[in-house]
């Protein structure tokens, strides 16, 4: 155990250049390459990316107000708590985010409310 502690202490005192040189020497001595662990890490990263694709937060985007713009403005005001002018500007400036970073269930509920008012909505 004392030998391992000494090795750890010696390795901790190396400069970056010395550590890189040590790495090359060990690769030659043991006949291995540092590139192999990188490839394994990259493959593992692909699996993690698949898990990340299942989103937990969604943005509700108003793409078009449709023919019933007044009803859509009323619904946007109810959802966001914005004033009349701000809600009108948001609706007329479509496509714009009505609400961001909401749960999947809330995003679906907001989409239904806005579509019932006559708007076209995307959830991203």
Swiss-Prot record:
One of its GO terms (biological process) is translation. Signal peptide: none annotated. Keywords: Ribonucleoprotein, Ribosomal protein. GO terms for cellular component: cytosolic large ribosomal subunit. The keyword Signal does not apply. It comes from the Bacteria. The keyword Ribosomal protein applies. InterPro entries: Ribosomal_bL12 (IPR000206), Ribosomal_bL12_C (IPR013823), Ribosomal_bL12_C/ClpS-like (IPR014719), Ribosomal_bL12_oligo (IPR008932), Ribosomal_bL12_oligo_N_sf (IPR036235). GO terms for molecular function: mRNA binding; structural constituent of ribosome. Forms part of the ribosomal stalk which helps the ribosome interact with GTP-bound translation factors. Is thus essential for accurate translation. Belongs to the bacterial ribosomal protein bL12 family. Homodimer. Part of the ribosomal stalk of the 50S ribosomal subunit. Forms a multimeric L10(L12)X complex, where L10 forms an elongated spine to which 2 to 4 L12 dimers bind in a sequential fashion. Binds GTP-bound translation factors. This is Large ribosomal subunit protein bL12. It comes from Allorhizobium ampelinum (strain ATCC BAA-846 / DSM 112012 / S4). The lineage of its organism: Bacteria, Pseudomonadati, Pseudomonadota, Alphaproteobacteria, Hyphomicrobiales.
